[in-house]
Structure formats: C-alpha cells, structure tokens
Amino acid sequence: MIIIPAVDIKNGKCVQLVQGEPGTEQVVIENPAEVAKQWEQKGAKKLHIVDLDGALGSGRNLSIVKEIIEKTKSPIQLGGGIRSVSDAKKLLEIGVNTVIIGTMAIKNPEIIKELSSEYGCERICVSLDSKNNKVVTHGWKESTDKTPIEYAKLFEKMGAGSILFTNVDVEGLLNGINLEPIKELLNNVSIPIIYSGGITSVDDLKVLSDIGVDYVVIGSALYKGLITLEDALKYQK
C-alpha cells in the first residue's frame, strides 16, 4: 500500500474543505508547491493534487500545477475539472503522471478508452465518488443511478489503469471509514484501488492495508495533525 498526501488547491492556496463544500475551508496554506515539496521531503512517493477551482467550475490553477511539477520529483496524480480530452492531454503533456477523470468519464465512458489507448492505462485513473452507494458527479452535486461497482467494472473494461474511490458520506468529517464499499470494489475489479475519505488514524491505515487497498490518499488527517506522514508511512509496503 502506498500513502499519498493530498494537496488541494483553491484560489491559489492549499486548503482542506469539509465534504467539498466551498466556504468550509478549515486549513489554508499560502504556497501549494512548497507544501507538495515538504510532503516529498518527508518521504511521500506520490502526490495527489486536486484543483478545487477546476472541480467547482471556477477556473484552473495550471501555473501552480506546473510549479509543483518543477519543484518535486515524485509522480503526480491530478484531478479536478478535467472537462475535455484536450484538458486531460494538456495535463499529461506538461508532466502530470496520472490524470483523474470523474464527471467527464461518467458522461462519456469512451473517453477513457481513447486516452488509455494513446497514453497508456497507467496514466488514466477514473474517480468514483460515492454517496448513499450511488456515484455522484459535478463536484458531488448530482447523483447518478449506478453504484460504484457498476461503474468500476465498466471503466476497467474501457482501459482505466486505476480507480480513485471517495466515500463522500465520510469525506472531510474525520469520523473514520466505512469498509464495506471498499471491500466490494476490491472483490469486483482487478485494477488498483486508490482510497480517499474519512481517514482519522493509523488504525484506519492498518485496516485498509490488511484488506488489500493499493493506495490511500490522506488529506485532512495530515493537515490537522491527527496522523503524521512518518507514522502513515509505516503502513507503506
């Protein structure tokens, strides 16, 4: 299991939101590129970047993404507001290792086949955000009629190299995790699962490692000091 610190960018700053809601910023740090560099220096092997302005439909933080790429050596996975094939290609071509595609993939699954054919499966990740066991889109504002498992099977066939699974019901609340949806995903697809949402302690990491999760994204718990990256990395295999 690989531990991936999150760097969420909004209005040019590193922030942490509660359940993705604008106006709920609980952590605000001025320089996202420096934050990313510090996580790398502390041992992170991969970085998870979220352009919240992109995800919320209010613009992009492309210059900051470029700065993070320049200042760090670790592979970067990036999501948030990728609304077209050209958006995805631009990010892949400036040095983002893996693009995380959510709403666009749900609307047009064939895009995943196109991108994975051109750039390789390992560079294409599909984000499945789950609320009440239904996949939600458009920054968690709209609900679909399909479960995460239904979509995960579809995108595995389409050539996605990994699935980022976020349980919106627990995301940012620091109340711990719900294992059942993750176990179901692990039992139904063979591509790597990246888990995000509700992690509060190293005990959560131990359980996720024990059930076979491949990657874990940690945000709020790191920024609020509930877990240190040093302790989290003890569960890295």
Swiss-Prot record:
GO biological process, one term: L-histidine biosynthetic process
Name of a matching Pfam family: His_biosynth
Localization: Cytoplasm
Catalytic activities: 1-(5-phospho-beta-D-ribosyl)-5-[(5-phospho-beta-D-ribosylamino)methylideneamino]imidazole-4-carboxamide = 5-[(5-phospho-1-deoxy-D-ribulos-1-ylimino)methylamino]-1-(5-phospho-beta-D-ribosyl)imidazole-4-carboxamide
The protein's annotated pathway: Amino-acid biosynthesis; L-histidine biosynthesis; L-histidine from 5-phospho-alpha-D-ribose 1-diphosphate: step 4/9
Broad class of enzyme this protein falls into: isomerase
Keywords: Amino-acid biosynthesis, Cytoplasm, Histidine biosynthesis, Isomerase
UniProt-annotated catalytic positions: D8, D129
GO CC terms, sorted: cytoplasm
Major subcellular site: cytoplasm
Source superkingdom: Archaea
Molecular-function GO term, any one: 1-(5-phosphoribosyl)-5-[(5-phosphoribosylamino)methylideneamino]imidazole-4-carboxamide isomerase activity
Family the UniProt entry places it in: Belongs to the HisA/HisF family.
Protein name: 1-(5-phosphoribosyl)-5-[(5-phosphoribosylamino)methylideneamino] imidazole-4-carboxamide isomerase
Source organism phylogeny: Archaea, Methanobacteriati, Methanobacteriota, Methanomada group, Methanobacteria
Gene coding for it: hisA
